[in-house]
Amino acid sequence: MAVLRSLLKSEDWMSLWIGLLIFALSLGLLVGADILGWAVKTNVWVSIGEALQPVSENYAGLGGGPSLVLTFLFLLILMTLAAKGLEANVPRFMSGFTVIFAVSYACWFLGHYAYIAATPDKLDALGIGWSMNLTGEAGYILALVVGLVGGAGIV
């Protein structure tokens, strides 16, 4: 019984179960069920209107903004259920998750700005003459800087 409790009541195991659930939902594509295709995808962008879109073409009519909201709500509900299972303070968790999601997605979004992220083969298609060539992963660098500055109490 103690082993079962540890499989359900530790953050490490809860992370594993959440990851496996999302992975299992994504396997729906193998049988033609596009279960998570509405999730948001961030493109390298020059114009903000081109930045967000659903992952799957099946949900292209949904648009980027609603796709981002649905992604946030899906993760908020899933993570809140996990936090409740871990007996966390749910209202505090939800507010903290919302702030962390907003800041981290803003970093990811800004990291995909074409002048930062475009690779040389994409410059002409984006209509720009230069780029820092960091790819979209520049959002990770930006998030690291924001985290270090925020963690140092500067923000």
Segments from the language model and where they lie:
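Helical membrane-embedded segments and adjacent short helical loop/helix-boundary regions
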Residues: L4-V155
